[in-house]
Design a protein with these regions (language model features):
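Carbohydrate-active catalytic/glycan-binding domains of CAZyme proteins
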Residues: 20, 25-486
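Positively charged n-region of N-terminal signal peptides that target proteins for export
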Residues: 1-6
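Bacterial N-terminal signal peptides
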Residues: 8-21
Length: 486
């Protein structure tokens, strides 16, 4: 998907990398990590830039671990704490709100994303009409875990909260739902908003051109208005009080009190979408200084009238705070060729050996580190980064020259990099013609100007000026350490 670039201005983007033991943040030395997702990430452009996203690829098959991953936190020794859910469904047909489903929270550790050691049960939920959905996230400020589970009753899907101070000892919060809404959710902590963010399905009355199994309700005063799936973004400082607090009530109208959320609280398809598109599920996560979300899209089908149709595709969304979302990559199927066997993610990524990894039961999917999104060009183009304080370190570039979608441009593709001072003047010795990259595809290309390194400029405020053709630029980093993803 390509997004034409308007002029934009961005302020300083620097980062403190965090190593976590059970998610407890330990500050390290300042590190540069510049990502490129939208026009907000570039300054003073020339030419035609576009922004894109990378679909996941299958890394390898793996044995199902007996649980579904929900939250992954890096440990100081390079391994990862993994929290997830083991779920067992009541075999009785049409059990519905009388179902006797069982679930438990589990903890394990991993070094490779497929082998899980030290597996233990940390909480066993009461038997009941639970769904198999789980959201689990960690607030490093208060050092508290939050888990959200859905429990069915005649009103619909009640969102129930569970808390833990250490990931091992969990307590149910209150004997009532936080709110009611649709039967799908994602959950993560936004360090920018200082809030838990819940990305949940909700239902909107809508005139569907092709009707599927979506319900209708007499309260809508129009039998042609049918439920379509859209998203709602809720947030909470502490996981106990949520905004918005409104509920999707009596979703099956069993109590005669059906009520949808107000339309202004919904994230709905827009004029750039197919008219029958629906947002079936969204699972987001924090990555460095922004959040990404994998959204599962759906559309009814004329081949299956009044029945559930196949899922349509998946999509990458991006946000600077977890609350307001952009959709610049609509034509990219986020989970790649694993769809429709894999229709969404269930956890924030593991970052192992230069890869962003997602476990999907019997497959491990991945993307090279920092390559979820990129800025690129077809012909010649230029842009500057936001200004940043140069650390005492070398700079590295994550780039593909030529871009993967333009292998025929191998001989003509290039990236050139210059360094500008705080006045926008080229720093002598760091002119762009001294740093030229061709026929390279690497996440950590050393940026050198002859025999010189930007390390010489440590302590100064600088910007990089990029010149590119038929290339993708994913990130600029200092050092080789990982990035916190929550």
């Amino acid at each position: 998907m390509r997004c034409d670039l308007p002029f934009c201005t961005v302020l300083v983007v620097t980062h403190l990398w965090f190593a976590c033991d059970f998610g407890v943040a330990q500050p390290a030395a300042p590190e540069v990590r510049l990502l490129f997702s939208t026009s907000q990430d570039v300054q003073n452009p020339w030419g035609r830039l576009h922004f894109g996203a990378t679909p996941m690829q299958k890394i390898r098959d793996c044995d199902p671990p007996g649980f579904t991953l929900a939250c992954c936190l890096p440990r100081a020794d390079g391994s990862w704490d993994v929290y997830g859910q083991a779920f067992s469904r009541d075999a009785a047909p049409e059990a519905d709100t009388r179902a006797k489903n069982t679930w438990k929270l589990v903890h394990a550790t991993t070094r490779d994303g497929t082998t899980f050691d030290n597996l233990e049960t940390v909480y066993a939920g009461a038997t009941g009409p639970w769904t198999d959905h789980l959201g689990l996230a960690y607030n490093p400020d208060t050092r508290e875990f939050l888990a959200l589970k859905l429990l069915m009753d005649d009103n619909g899907f009640g969102y129930r909260a569970f808390f833990s101070a250490n990931g091992r000892d969990w307590t149910a919060y209150a004997d009532k739902p936080l709110f009611y809404d649709g039967d799908s959710l994602g959950l993560f902590w936004s360090p920018v908003s200082k809030r838990f963010v819940c990305t949940n399905k909700t239902l909107q009355p809508y005139l569907k051109h092709i009707q599927d199994h979506g319900g209708t309700h007499p309260q809508n005063n129009n039998d042609q208005l049918r439920d379509r799936r859209v998203l709602a973004i809720r947030s909470s400082v502490d996981g106990r009080q949520w905004e918005p607090a409104e509920s999707l009530m009596d979703v099956w109208n069993r109590l005669g009190s059906y009520r949808a959320l107000p339309a202004e609280l919904m994230l709905t398809p827009d004029a750039d979408d197919p008219p029958d598109l629906e947002h079936y599920r969204g699972v987001g996560f924090w990555y460095h200084d922004r959040s990404y979300m994998v959204v599962l899209n759906y559309a009814a089908s004329a081949l299956t009238p009044r029945k559930h149709a196949p899922q349509l595709d998946t999509e990458w969304w991006v946000s600077r705070n977890g609350l307001k979302w952009e959709r610049p990559y609509r034509d990219i199927n986020a989970v790649g060729d694993s769809f429709p066997g894999v229709v969404c993610i269930t956890h924030n990524p593991l970052l192992i050996d230069g890869m962003i990894l997602f476990h999907t039961g019997n497959q491990l999917l991945g993307i090279p580190q920092d390559r979820i999104s990129f800025v690129g060009s077809r012909a010649n183009a230029e842009f500057s980064t936001a200004p940043f304080a140069m650390p005492k370190a070398d700079l590295q570039l994550n780039a593909a020259v030529p871009a993967p979608e333009r292998p025929f441009a191998k001989q003509q593709a290039y990236v050139m990099v210059g360094i500008l001072d705080d006045q926008g003047t080229v720093v002598p010795g760091f002119e762009p013609d001294k740093c030229v990259l061709q026929i390279v595809d690497q996440i950590d290309l050393p940026l050198r100007w002859g025999d010189r390194s930007a390390r010489e400029l440590s302590g100064r405020t600088i910007r990089l000026r990029f010149y590119l053709r038929s290339a993708n630029i994913y990130a600029v980093t200092s050092g080789t350490r990982g990035v916190h993803a929550g």
